Amino acid sequence: MEYKYNSDTLMHGVGFNFSKFESILSHGILSLECGKAENVRINRSFKGHNKDDEISMVRYLYIDAYDDFDIKLFNKEGAYYRYILNGISFIVEDVQFETQKAHRVDEVLVKNKVELDKIKGIQISDKYKDALLEDLFYFPMSKNYENIKNIGEEYIRYMASYGYEVNINEYKNLINELRYTYNALIDASKEDIEDLEDDYEDVLADLNEYMAQNISACFRKKFGYDITLYDLVIFLRNKNKVNLPIYIIPYTREKGKAK
């Protein structure tokens, strides 16, 4: 089953953040400002260029590469590759957007909120469809410690809602190590930055491994076996009583087409 995109079709990625995924199924896609107004907790993944009343999205029109398009540059600069192919995403239609202030080549900005009736489908790339939960990455490669900490706390609350408690001391040790590394990185001289960036990424990888094991254990406890990403997306969609089709999209893109 393939979705029939048009030039104004938009996409919004949530990574593998199942808490955010469920929140959108209940409330629509909210900006930080709307989240506060509606008492819905919204966490940033990155310190982006969008303001608190704006939502970052990808416009389908901008991902259709021309014959002379440098696909390596697109993968580096494009939001589609980073945030749509590498996670769960929503298809959005019939909303107004702005292009002038967007940061990435295929990014647009939507004001305030996307209502549920504007969301037309869910997307997962074929690379991750059958992946087990323990094999996914749950934190963005962000150099913003506060964002990472907020997302980690969100995951802990989310797992608690399913009756699963993490080893909080282990989490605190990892998040504190990330904070120490982050502070050292902020204060570093130019000569030390590269090594400290590597240290930061190593700690973030350890934190992701910790969270992946716990999220996997949380849903293993619920279902009695290890489920795939696709299985969980179906379960969460049905749990929230949302009748949205799920589309599997190709992970690999070539010049001018998807493969």
Where are the language model's segments positioned?
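Short, surface-exposed loop/strand segments
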Residues: 33, 39-47
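Short glycine-centered helix-capping/turn motifs at secondary-structure transition points
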Residues: 28-32
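Active-site and NAD+-binding cores of ADP-ribose-processing enzymes
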Residues: 2-27, 37-38, 51-259
